[in-house]
């Protein structure tokens, strides 16, 4: 699936699972703010309800294997940030500013614009 197809898929399956440790965010909990802005929810496990698996550094291989067995789209953390404009184009972004953090502090990320 390309990013546009994944965005369409997330309109029906709004649960996302993150495995591993984010390199671009302070922690996996920072994904919660981002998911909220797109009407998505974090899954507690990989299941048939999961719409997307985001793979960060040092992921759990069994989560990747489970997602693959269930034909769940699997993308990297970098691809997630490339997917965000596709979600916005489908009207999934609620207009809420999305805070995200790195080791230098908290920044504002404006979807579709310059942060």
What do these predicted regions represent?
Residues 1-115:
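DNA strand-break repair and replication-stress modules
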């Amino acid at each position: 699936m390309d990013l546009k197809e994944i965005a369409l898929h997330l309109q029906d399956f709004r649960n996302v699972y993150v495995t591993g440790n984010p390199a671009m965010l302070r922690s996996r909990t920072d994904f919660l703010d981002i998911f909220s802005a797109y009407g998505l929810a974090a899954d507690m496990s990989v299941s048939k309800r999961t719409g997307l698996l985001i793979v960060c550094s040092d992921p759990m291989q069994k989560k990747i294997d489970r997602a693959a067995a269930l034909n769940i789209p699997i993308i990297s953390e970098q691809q997630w940030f490339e997917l965000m404009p596709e979600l916005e184009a489908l009207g999934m972004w609620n207009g809420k500013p999305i805070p995200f953090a790195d080791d230098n502090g908290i920044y504002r990320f404006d979807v579709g614009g310059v942060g």
